[in-house]
Amino acid sequence: MDDNLQLADGGFTKNVARSGRRARQSAEMMSAEDSRQRRSSSSISTAAEGPPPKPTRRQGGWAEESSTTTNVRSGRRAAAEEPEDRRLRPQTPEGSDNESGEDIPVIPDLEEVQEEDLTMQIAAPPSVQVNRVMTYRDLDNDLMKFSAFQTLDGEIDLKLLTKVLAPEQEVREEDVGWDWDHLEVSSELQSEWDEGDREDQSPLPVCV
C-alpha cells in the first residue's frame, strides 16, 4: 500500500503526500511514530557505546588526616629544634684549629693545690682615725696660756669672762651618796619651802 512507510537510513520517508482531514491525522501519527523511533534509536546508540565512566572515589578519612597532621607536626618540631640544637652545640671561635689541644681545659691535680690554713691567720684590726675630744681642763689651760682664745671671731672680747673664771678646785663639788630616807626628807623640805614662798608672795590685805 501507498500509506506504508519505508525505513531508509534510520529515517522515515513518505511516498505520496495526501491532503484533507485524513491526511492531517496520518501526518500527526507519522510525527509521533517518528519521535518514538528517534528515542529508541538514541537509546540503542547509547547502549552500544557503553555505560558512562564512574566518578573517582575520594579516598580519605581519619587515618589520612592523622598522617598529614603528624607530618605537619613533625615538620614544626624539627624546625623548632634546629635553633635549639645550634645553641647547644659547642661553638669554637673562627680561625681556631680544633685539632690542637689549646682549647681543652686542664684540670689540676689535688696534690698541686695548696691547702690554706685559715686557723693561723688573724685579721688585722681596722684603722679608724678618731678625733680626740678636748676636756674642760684642756680648754681652761688653752684659755690661760693662749691669748688668741680671749677673742671670739676677732670681734668679741672675752677678757672680762676669763678674769672671773674660778679655778676647778673651787667649783668642783664632792659626790654625796643619797638613799631613800634622804630623798624623802629632801622632798618634804622642798614642799615646805614652796608653801612658804607662796605665803610670802601672797598680796597683803588693803585697809579701807
Curated annotation (Swiss-Prot):
It is found in: Cytoplasm, Cytoskeleton; Cell projection, Cilium. GO terms for cellular component: cilium; cytoplasm; cytoskeleton; intraciliary transport particle A. Residues 1-105, 187-208 are annotated as: Disordered. It holds the Pfam family IFT43. InterPro entries: IFT43. Disulfide bonds: none annotated. Residues 78-88 have a biased composition (Basic and acidic residues). GO terms for biological process: cilium assembly; intraciliary retrograde transport. The keyword Cytoplasm applies. The keyword Cytoplasm applies. Keywords: Cell projection, Cilium biogenesis/degradation, Cytoplasm, Cytoskeleton. Component of the IFT complex A (IFT-A) complex. As a component of IFT complex A (IFT-A), a complex required for retrograde ciliary transport and entry into cilia of G protein-coupled receptors (GPCRs), it is involved in ciliogenesis. Involved in retrograde ciliary transport along microtubules from the ciliary tip to the base. Belongs to the IFT43 family. This is Intraflagellar transport protein 43 homolog.
